[in-house]
C-alpha cells in the first residue's frame, strides 16, 4: 500500500513522514527496506563503521526485516513492539548463543533509534526490548615479555615467510587490527608519511615511527622475496605469492606460541586483546579505544575495563 505514491523516493517529504508516523500498520516492507538502506548509509558516512561491522548489521537486520515481512503477510495487524517481541522469541527458538542474540537485539535497537532520530517513526518500538545478558569470559592477553618471546621465534629465522610473520606480529600487536583486517591489507593501506594504517575512509590506526621503518623496509625488500606477480596488491603474501589467509596466519601464530613455550591458547585475537588492554592501562579513553578497534558498540570495548587474568 502506497497511498501517496512516494514509496520509491529516497528523500522523504514532511507530508510522507507525517502520514507514516500515524499509519505504521500500513508501512510496507518495501518502505522499511528503504529505511534499512538509509540506516546502513548513515553508519557508513556518519559513523565510519568498518565493512565487517556493516556486514554484521546487514545480516542481522535482513533477518529482522524478513521476519516482520512474513508476519505482515499473514494479514494480522499488530504493533511493531509486539512484532519485535515475537522476533526475540523466534531468535531464542533458533537456539542462537546468548552473545549472538544480544548482538541481533542491539542491531535492532540501533535501527529503530535511527528511525526515530530521522523522523521516520514517532516512538521507538524497540526501546523496551530486553537485551540478553552476556556472561563475559576472562580475556586472554600477553604481557610485554610474553609478546617478546612470541616475536623472537619469528625473528630468529631468516626465511622470507618468517620475516613476513615478524612484521605481521608487530603490526597486529601495535594496532589491534582484527585478523581479517590484517590479511585484507593492501600495500596502499600503509601510510608511511603519517605512520598509520588506513582501514577505510573513516578509520585510521596510528603506529610508532619504529614500526614505520620496519614496514618501509618490508615493502622495499622482504615482501619482494614472496612476490611473483607485480600486479598483486596484497601486503602479506604466502609462499605462492598470493594473499595469506586468516586461517594460515592463525596456524602460524599457534606454531610460534608453541615453540615459545607459551601456555594456553594464543591466537591473533590474543594480540588484539593485548593491544586494547595496554592502551587502557596507558590512559587511552574508552571511546577513543572503540574507534581504534572499530567496535560498533561501546559495550564491546568496555569488556577490557574488567579485571582479566593473563593467559594460562
What do the predicted segments below correspond to?
Residues 16-312:
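Conserved catalytic core of the tyrosine transesterase superfamily
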Residues 7-11, 21:
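Charged/polar low-complexity intrinsically disordered segments
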